[in-house]
Amino acid sequence: MGDSEIQYLLEKLKKLEEDYYKLRELYRRLEDEKKFIESERIRYEREVRRLRSEVERLRSPPLLVGVVSDILEDGRVVVKSSTGPKFVVNTSQYINEEELKPGARVALNQQTLAIVNVLPTSKDPMVYGFEVEEKPEVSYEDIGGLDVQIEEIREAVELPLLKPELFAEVGIEPPKGVLLYGPPGTGKTLLAKAVANQTRATFIRVVGSEFVQKYIGEGARLVREVFQLAKEKAPSIIFIDELDAIAARRTNSDTSGDREVQRTMMQLLAELDGFDPRGDVKVIGATNRIDILDPAILRPGRFDRIIEVPLPTFEGRIQIFKIHTRKMKLAEDVDFKELARITEGASGADIKAICTEAGMFAIREERAKVTMLDFTKAIEKVLKKTTPIPDLKGVMFV
């Protein structure tokens, strides 16, 4: 065999090797495409099954809503349908019998009226709006001059939720509720915000006037549903601000509005210390008119701990000034002791307004630092504005 033939065979072998590598690469690529197509086919089949089940679900007939009236000995249930009449019906074997009790809402099959599902308790949409989803950013470090009040509210609200075994060991029941009272602007709502920040419990905030409704029974129903929501989401804390709006002392008033407010308060009294136990549900009330509250709501068992939130003392005013000026750039002449001395009788809200006004005076003069003079002018402006207007009864104006 000559050299030319050997050279020809080597070139042919090399070409065959190149073709082999190309075919192998093509095979790998086709295998990858096949796997991708297979995965896509499986995904589309799942999507088709999901869409078919969705179509079947949408084609299924609607269910009737009824309320369980009674449960018979043979397992059948007396149900009052939404159309009015009562029926004796059977139940699905997949329903938990413990959930079937008088008053429960159930779904009924249109043809046989058999119970196919137990529905959750109906609540007013407003009730779900009372629940605080995002915790406030206020902590106990942001509250000045209320160390005793903070300790008392933590003992009454936080400790029973975080360490209930301490009360069981001593053999006492933890306090059920706390009432905060004091002049406006002293930090009652701020204390409740700090409690919401510190605890992992569900926090439900209600303003007392929101319980006052137009129609008879609506306010009492709202109170009942708020406490029911708190029990379902226990451990939980209910904060009722401006409690005097619904808990004022009962009088012999003949107006329908006053009578409805009194009915709402009686429902609140029953929920605070009624026949049914509250469980891990704590109540915090706040008011600045404790003198007009009904004596029934102040007795132990409803609000076990009544905490006064007074106007800040000299040391308390110094702490509050320091808290509200933490992020401010202050001149060297700012003296907190002098500021606390000349703000005798000011509330925490007044001091916050003073700090804001002092900053505004500095901005007006295009300065980055706030001086003592700015604070002095702010004190004069804010405290003059909050001074009570003199009684002008009987004075005639020309």
Swiss-Prot record:
GO terms for cellular component: cytoplasm; proteasome-activating nucleotidase complex. Residues 396-398 are annotated as: Docks into pockets in the proteasome alpha-ring to cause gate opening. Disulfide bonds: none annotated. GO terms for biological process: proteasomal protein catabolic process; protein unfolding. Keywords: ATP-binding, Chaperone, Coiled coil, Cytoplasm, Nucleotide-binding, Proteasome. It is found in: Cytoplasm. InterPro entries: 26S_Proteasome_ATPase (IPR050221), AAA+_ATPase (IPR003593), AAA_lid_3 (IPR041569), ATPase_AAA_core (IPR003959), ATPase_AAA_CS (IPR003960), NA-bd_OB-fold (IPR012340), Nucleotidase_PAN (IPR023501), P-loop_NTPase (IPR027417). Residues 3-60 form a coiled coil. ATP binds at residues 185-190, 324. Homohexamer. The hexameric complex has a two-ring architecture resembling a top hat that caps the 20S proteasome core at one or both ends. Upon ATP-binding, the C-terminus of PAN interacts with the alpha-rings of the proteasome core by binding to the intersubunit pockets. Belongs to the AAA ATPase family. Consists of three main regions, an N-terminal coiled-coil domain that may assist in substrate recognition, an interdomain involved in PAN hexamerization, and a C-terminal ATPase domain of the AAA type. This is Proteasome-activating nucleotidase. It comes from Archaeoglobus fulgidus (strain ATCC 49558 / DSM 4304 / JCM 9628 / NBRC 100126 / VC-16). The lineage of its organism: Archaea, Methanobacteriati, Methanobacteriota, Archaeoglobi, Archaeoglobales.
